[in-house]
């Protein structure tokens, strides 16, 4: 019997669980190891060099778990580490891409707001993407220090208070398209829609998972409601707080 393909996913904390949920929508017989580096979260306000070291350490751990590929299910980790680690590891390293391209192409000439961590906003990867799309004038970059940390704490009331003035300001500027440039923020979609009902939200999870499965030559068949998922996953959270394990379970079971 053929062994299932083993894939490693990593994030600074809970955000990558939104990517894991996307992966579990497919009828793909996978063995998934998820590592949440909560001990060192959040990544988004650290220096890029420190993030690189943290991500390298997690990837070394995942390689010892005998994974065949690693997905950095974290925009900050991707921005700071993906390019370097692809040269260091013999297995494929995949990363996240903010969904700026579909947002720009589907709304020609219209402004697009990008919510992301300070590291993601600063790094060359994002500047290069905006330049390739000739979208420097159209992308309104909004740095959100501390917001991912509120998701890791499960403090969605504080997250809503944090987002309200940002969303109100976007409505005043007639910005109708919002890109979530951090996998943590995907868990805030309902809060965003509650405060900004007409906004069109884009995130990179679906495109990333399609690219991952295509690259690994895994069939992309969406599960229907009655099918059982044949993939199995293991959650590793380097946290001593039982709360984090309960929160992870809650986030994985959230309806979209």
UniProtKB/Swiss-Prot annotation:
Protein origin, superkingdom: Bacteria
Annotated metabolic or biological route of this protein: Cell wall biogenesis; peptidoglycan biosynthesis
Chemical reaction(s) catalysed: L-glutamate = D-glutamate
InterPro entries: Asp/Glu/hydantoin_racemase (IPR015942), Asp/Glu_race (IPR001920), Glu_race (IPR004391)
Keywords per UniProt: Cell shape, Cell wall biogenesis/degradation, Isomerase, Peptidoglycan synthesis
Alphabetized GO MF terms: glutamate racemase activity
Keyword Cell wall biogenesis/degradation among UniProt keywords: yes
The enzyme's E.C. designation: 5.1.1.3
Family matches, as Pfam families: Asp_Glu_race
Residues the entry annotates as binding substrate: 11-12, 43-44, 75-76, 183-184
Gene Ontology annotations of biological process type: cell wall organization; peptidoglycan biosynthetic process; regulation of cell shape
Top enzyme category: isomerase
UniProt-annotated catalytic positions: 74 (proton donor/acceptor), 182 (proton donor/acceptor)
Statement: the UniProt record of this protein carries the keyword Lyase: no
Family: Belongs to the aspartate/glutamate racemases family.
The protein's role, per its UniProt record: Provides the (R)-glutamate required for cell wall biosynthesis.
Protein name, entry field: Glutamate racemase
């Amino acid at each position: 019997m053929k062994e299932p393909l083993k894939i490693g996913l990593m994030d600074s904390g809970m955000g990558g669980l939104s990517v894991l949920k996307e992966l579990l929508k497919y009828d793909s017989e996978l063995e998934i190891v998820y590592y949440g580096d909560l001990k060192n979260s959040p990544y988004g306000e650290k220096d890029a060099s420190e993030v690189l070291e943290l991500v390298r350490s997690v990837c070394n751990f995942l390689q010892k778990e005998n994974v065949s590929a690693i997905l950095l299910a974290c925009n900050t980790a991707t921005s700071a580490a993906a390019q370097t680690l692809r040269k260091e590891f013999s297995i494929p390293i995949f990363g996240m891409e903010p969904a700026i391209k579909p947002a720009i192409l589907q709304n020609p000439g219209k402004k697009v707001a990008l919510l992301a961590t300070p590291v993601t906003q600063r790094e060359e990867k994002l500047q290069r993407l905006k330049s390739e799309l000739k979208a420097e004038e159209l992308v309104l970059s909004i740095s959100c220090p501390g917001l991912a940390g509120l998701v890791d704490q499960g403090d969605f009331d504080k997250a809503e208070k944090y987002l309200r003035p940002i969303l109100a300001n976007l409505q005043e500027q007639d910005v109708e398209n919002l890109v979530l440039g951090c996998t943590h923020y995907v868990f805030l979609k309902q809060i965003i829609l509650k405060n900004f009902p007409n906004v069109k939200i884009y995130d990179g999870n679906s495109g990333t998972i399609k690219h991952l499965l295509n690259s690994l030559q895994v069939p992309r068949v969406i599960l229907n409601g009655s099918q059982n998922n044949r993939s199995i996953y293991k959650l590793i959270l380097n946290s001593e707080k039982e709360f984090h394990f309960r929160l992870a379970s809650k986030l994985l079971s959230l309806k979209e």
